[in-house]
Amino acid sequence: VIKREHLPIQIIHIVEIFSVAIMSTKHSKAAEKFLQDSKMAAWHNETLWMVRAKRDKMSKEVPEWEELRNKACELKLYSNSHLEELLLEFEKNATANGAIVHWAKDADEYCAIVYEILNEHNVHHFIKSKSMLAEECGLNPFLMERGIDVVESDLGERILQLMHLEPSHIVLPAIHIKREQVGELFEKEMGTEKGNFDPTYLTHAARKNLRHLFLNAEAAMTGANFAVASTGDIVVCTNEGNADMGTSYPKLNIAAFGMEKIVPDLDALGVFTRLLARSATGQPVTTYTSHYRRPREGGEYHIIIVDNGRSALLSKPDHIKTLNCIRCGACMNTCPVYRRSGGYSYTYFIPGPIGINLGMAHAPEKYYDNLSACSLCMSCSDVCPVKVDLAEQIYKWRQDLDGLGKANTGKKIMSGGMKFLMERPALFNAALWAAPVVNGLPRFMKYNDLDDWGKGRELPEFASESFNEMWKKNKVQGKEESK
């Protein structure tokens, strides 16, 4: 048949099949580890679904919710198509306000600029609020290697810093940590009462511990939820007020943002602030929405605008909407895969649907294995407040895998085999006739490293007769006949 049909023959070493199969299941293996603690996995799933439910309740209380989503998407697409114009306008206004604006093309340049500023001012104690950009660029380890003490002031981030862990969620960084673990950590680090796991007590202990760190900081840093071109404002949204506390004492303050955070004006900002907290945590608005415009009297205010691969996305029409993201985390809260596998099962530092897309945009050869962590249920696309077509983009990235040389060899062989059979009815029917033999095979033959599909699923029993065979034997009856 192969000779007659002039079908291509590909020679593949068995080691290649095994290696690709193994590489393609990094997420599955990490998720398996997460699921070993069934109680924690169930709690993680239920907690995030509760946040999703709060988001739904809040969105239904705003009659113009869909109109806001459409407007936000339009504003983001406008901003992303006018980035140079808006960023230069921001620089002009921020400079007029007294800020010093820097541009960083990549993570290395960003880290170097921050260090240069701190080093010039002889800073050794540095406090910062939550910034996913700092995580993206590896700022903390970069500074600490050079003798600068970095303190995270966000409570969740501070807990993780003391535990030497990375965030597992972009809004709820310590969502995977139980209060009992926090109590034990604070007992060790802060001398709290043994066995006291009361959240209020632990929060007060953290507040007391952070107070002297705020007062003794020589410089402070914030990220940015938004940067307003028309005013030169940096806008930071928090529930703890830690960004305001951090910037209130030191004379030296730094803000940094990825260039996609730019919005045209304050009217546009109002659209996003109505969507952000409702989508992220189910609140009408964050407790604090702070505008930073100019340096303190006698101080300096530095603003760093970072590219780090963002401009490259502008040349990818299928994926440009990724730049719409406002980092609300709603896609993670709704994603059935993320909720049941945890943030550490992904290889990119941002997990969930948006992390899959950002990782592929940043380095597809490195992060392609995350593409398997999606069921294409489309829930992420449905809840995104700025209408990023997350699931559709994941599907498009999957289609690009073969061109990247990262398509799973085992799956390619299986798909090619199915195509071959389905184009030849006689062979297909013969395969169906032989299929029940699989039912009696030992498990190691059905579930192994060659079978990615079977790693998380049970193969159903093959029927002794196919529908086609039953039809030919008049065993199939319509509704009227069966009556």
Where are these regions (language model features)?
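The feature marks the mature, well-folded catalytic cores of soluble enzymes
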Residues: A21-D318
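Intrinsic disorder at enzyme termini
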Residues: H27, M40-T47, M414, F420-K483
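Ferredoxin-type iron-sulfur electron-transfer modules in oxidoreductases and energy-metabolism complexes
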Residues: Y288, R296-T322, Y338-F444
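Extended amphipathic alpha-helical segments enriched in small hydrophobics
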Residues: C328-M332, C377
